[in-house]
Amino acid sequence: MYDSNAYNDDIPYVIRQNDRKFVIIPYSFDTNDMRFDGNNGFIQGDDFNTYCKESFNQLLSETDDGSLRMMSIGLHPRIIGRPGRIKGLEDFIKHIKTYQNVWIPTRIDIAKHCLEKDLFNFF
């Protein structure tokens, strides 16, 4: 039904594979907890929160004309679930929940929605 191993776009898109529709849900490394691992990334939970908030706020501002946007966040329990990091994620979720027209789906929910609504067909 879907694949999320693409890095070539910011929004999902539908392709045809073996006469069936297949949703590509792009993955992102910048809003990803893997940036805690290594020397060039996040250090504190608030670093993650701040970066995600700024990304979210920018994407939200780009919807003023009716455009659709998606923000993909890669999370790994062994990384974001650490005591010094989880609060950054919790604070970010609190921030986005203050907005009325924001949907927080799983990838399978995104794929089903794209197929049901016939969104983003590029074939």
Language model features by range: what are they?
Residues 1-67, 123:
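Active-site-adjacent pocket scaffolds in enzyme catalytic domains
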Residues 53-123:
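C-terminal domain-boundary segment and adjacent tail
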